[in-house]
A protein has these predicted regions:
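Mixed-charge interfacial surface used for oligomerization/domain docking
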Residues: 1-23, 29-200
């Protein structure tokens, strides 16, 4: 896993188990993706009748969160063992920028691009693959808008007219794994409503 937080949360829950009911849900994501789940949990707590229903809603949202990054350098990916030394050396020689996704709580290499413009375009292509997006946030590691984020917002505005997607910072724990020069997207896909008319 990316972080030991799940195990720590379970131990903490056991310590106070006698005072209240606590259910630990593995977010299987990072950074803004976790913030999206918190908002889902708050809304579910207001709308649902039981703790079980709240947990069901949150676990359903876990399956609808997708996070991807590209990073300008591979040094941190080598140190965190996300990429092998041979791939890192070859990538540095070719000047490529790796794409990463968060899959089942792990950072996984997806593909590679050669230029920043290609990386931005690939992020946009990834976003437009979704037919209905409930929420999407651009991820960066700076308090002010980076040039990559500005480019990405402009491209997303073309593909999603009438919608604005803000940017947020990913924290030091993630920066220690992927570096401080990554740009990414956290996407919460809209929940698909089941149509009872299709029942046979």
């Amino acid at each position: 896993e990316i972080s030991p937080s799940r195990g720590m949360a379970r131990r903490a829950a056991q310590q106070v188990a006698g005072n209240c009911r606590i259910v630990v849900v593995d977010s299987e994501t990072v950074s803004v993706g976790q913030a999206m789940l918190v908002r889902v949990a708050v809304r579910a707590a207001q709308e649902q009748d039981t703790l079980e229903d709240v947990v069901r809603v949150v676990r359903g949202a876990v399956e609808r969160i997708y996070t991807v990054f590209y990073t300008e350098s591979m040094d941190y990916l080598l140190q965190s063992r996300i990429m092998s030394p041979s791939h890192t050396i070859l990538g540095a020689m070719l000047g490529i920028k790796p794409f990463l996704s968060v899959e089942n709580g792990r950072l996984q290499p997806m593909e590679k691009v050669r230029t920043r413009a290609q990386a931005i375009e690939r992020l946009v292509e990834y976003a437009v693959e979704f037919s209905d997006i409930e929420d999407m946030v651009i991820l960066q590691h700076k308090p002010f808008m980076s040039e990559q984020t500005r480019m990405l917002q402009e491209r997303l505005a073309v593909e999603f007219p009438g919608r604005h997607f803000p940017y947020g910072m990913y924290g030091p724990s993630l920066a220690a794994l992927i570096g401080a020069d990554a740009t990414g997207l956290a996407i919460l896909e809209s929940e698909i409503e089941k149509d009872d008319d299709d029942f046979f």
